[in-house]
Amino acid sequence: MRLTPHEQERLLLSYAAELARRRQARGLKLNHPEAVAVITDHILEGARDGRTVAELMVSGRAVLGRADVMDGVPEMLHDVQVEATFPDGTKLVTVHHPIP
């Protein structure tokens, strides 16, 4: 299978998010990269499902809570920005303060 660099990046991100979700299911708190991967994957999959940028900006803040991540992670994550492919093209989705 041959993948473009963009496709490789998306696949790696998807795997990182899946690994983070498995760790979360075992009761572990997520670190910074794991939290970013889960939120980013939520946005990419939401765009693929046809949700709007506005919907994803709101729902991206509900993916994880403070109880889901290690101490200090919410303070490190000011914004998560993702270029997602929507049915009408690629758009930048910004989630401000993704872990309220």
From Swiss-Prot:
Enzyme class comes to: hydrolase
Reaction catalyzed: urea + 2 H2O + H(+) = hydrogencarbonate + 2 NH4(+)
Pfam (any one)? Urease_gamma
Cleaved signal peptide residues: none
Q: State the EC number(s).
A: 3.5.1.5
GO biological process assignments: urea catabolic process
Q: Which Gene3D superfamilies match?
A: Urease, gamma-like subunit
Single GO cellular component annotation? Answer: cytoplasm
- Which top-level group of life is the source organism from? Bacteria
Q: In which pathway does it act?
A: Nitrogen metabolism; urea degradation; CO(2) and NH(3) from urea (urease route): step 1/1
State the Gene Ontology terms under molecular function.
Answer: nickel cation binding; urease activity
Q: Where in the cell is it found?
A: Cytoplasm
Keyword set, alphabetical order: Cytoplasm, Hydrolase
Q: Hey, which family's this protein in? A: Belongs to the urease gamma subunit family.
PANTHER family, from UniProt?
A: UREASE
Spell out the subunit comment: Heterotrimer of UreA (gamma), UreB (beta) and UreC (alpha) subunits. Three heterotrimers associate to form the active enzyme.
What is the protein name given in its UniProt record?
Urease subunit gamma
What organism is listed for this UniProt entry? Mycolicibacterium vanbaalenii (strain DSM 7251 / JCM 13017 / BCRC 16820 / KCTC 9966 / NRRL B-24157 / PYR-1) (Mycobacterium vanbaalenii)
Give the gene symbol.
ureA
